[in-house]
Curated annotation (Swiss-Prot):
Hemocytes and pharyngeal tissues. The keyword Cell inner membrane does not apply. Residues 1-19 form the signal peptide. Keywords: Amidation, Antibiotic, Antimicrobial, Secreted, Signal. One of its GO terms (biological process) is defense response to bacterium. This is Clavanin-C. Has antimicrobial activity against E.coli, L.monocytogenes and C.albicans. The modification Phenylalanine amide is found at residue 52. It is found in: Secreted. GO terms for cellular component: extracellular region.
Length: 80
């Protein structure tokens, strides 16, 4: 009787341990997916801010060129 109870207890603990491992792997998958989503949202916000010129306002810079320059560059507003 004691042996049967002991065997059932050991089997039960094994099943619980397996289900804990399965839950852990599912949680890791969810956290990995959330991390990817957050990363992509951050990239989108970063690109969006550059497209619409938030850097120009935030850093006090303008996008333009001097007469002697061939291309356009970022300049400090103090250089005008």
């Amino acid at each position: 009787m004691k042996t049967t109870i002991l065997i059932l207890l050991i089997l039960g603990l094994g099943i619980n341990a397996k289900s804990l491992e399965e839950r852990k792997s599912e949680e890791e998958k969810v956290f990995h997916l959330l991390g990817k989503i957050i990363h992509h949202v951050g990239n989108f916000v970063y690109g969006f801010s550059h497209v619409f010129g938030d850097d120009q306002q935030d850093n006090g810079k303008f996008y333009g060129h001097y007469a002697e320059d061939n291309g356009k560059h970022w300049y400090d507003t103090g250089d005008q």
